[in-house]
A protein has these predicted regions:
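Mg2+-dependent prenyl diphosphate-binding active-site environment of isoprenoid biosynthetic enzymes
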Residues: 1-196
Length: 196
């Protein structure tokens, strides 16, 4: 699951043009720095990031397939894993499309749906439910676990949005990254609604 998480973050950072993650340069920025001031450094960083993300995806599937869990449990977990990856991709598309719209034309429900698909599914639900599947938990227990993880994942994403502003260093840049990138977060949406 760590490989899956890294796969999503490498692609997400590239799509968002993020320069840092957890205070360190993102993967595509590392590639650009490594290549130096070449005219193609940025393009190369982007291209390598896409392929590295793809490799991490393949490795996450291969790692699951190589485990010693019962075949039926492993197959069920792989099916769920691929479903989570699909949801994450759809959520990323929603995030990109929301980014192209004016904040006044975006609803809190659309942002929450994006959070659920893009973040909650793979950060909270997938690790918990996949562990339950591999342990042989019933479909009902898996569903119960997914329902418990949903609000935790949403809370995590909202906290992450708040941290973007609370750890903002105006010496580094003029505005927090989410604002510079036009991210449609619940925090930005709420501020718009109140200040409208």
């Amino acid at each position: 699951l760590e490989l899956l998480h890294a796969f999503v973050l490498v692609h997400d950072d590239l799509i968002d043009r993020s320069e840092k993650r957890r205070g360190l340069p993102t993967f595509h920025k590392l590639v650009e720095q490594r290549l130096g001031p070449l005219s193609t450094a940025e393009r190369t960083g982007h291209g390598v990031s896409v392929v590295v993300g793809d490799l991490l995806f393949a490795l996450s599937v291969e790692t699951l397939q190589g485990t010693s869990f019962m075949e039926g449990h492993r197959s069920a977990a792989l099916k769920k894993l691929l479903s989570y990856i699909t949801d994450t991709g759809v959520g990323e598309i929603f995030d990109i499309l929301l980014g192209s719209r004016d904040i006044g034309r975006v609803t809190a429900q659309e942002i929450e749906r994006t959070y659920l698909l893009k973040t909650t599914r793979y950060t909270f639900e997938a690790p918990s439910v996949l562990g339950a599947v591999l342990a042989g938990a019933s479909p009902e227990k898996q569903e119960d676990l997914a329902l418990v993880m949903e609000p935790l994942g949403l809370a995590f994403q909202i906290q992450n949005d708040l941290l973007e502003f609370s750890h903002f260093d105006s010496r580094d840049q003029l505005l927090p990254t989410d604002l510079l990138e036009g991210k449609k977060t619940l925090l930005v949406h709420e501020a718009y609604e109140r200040l409208g």
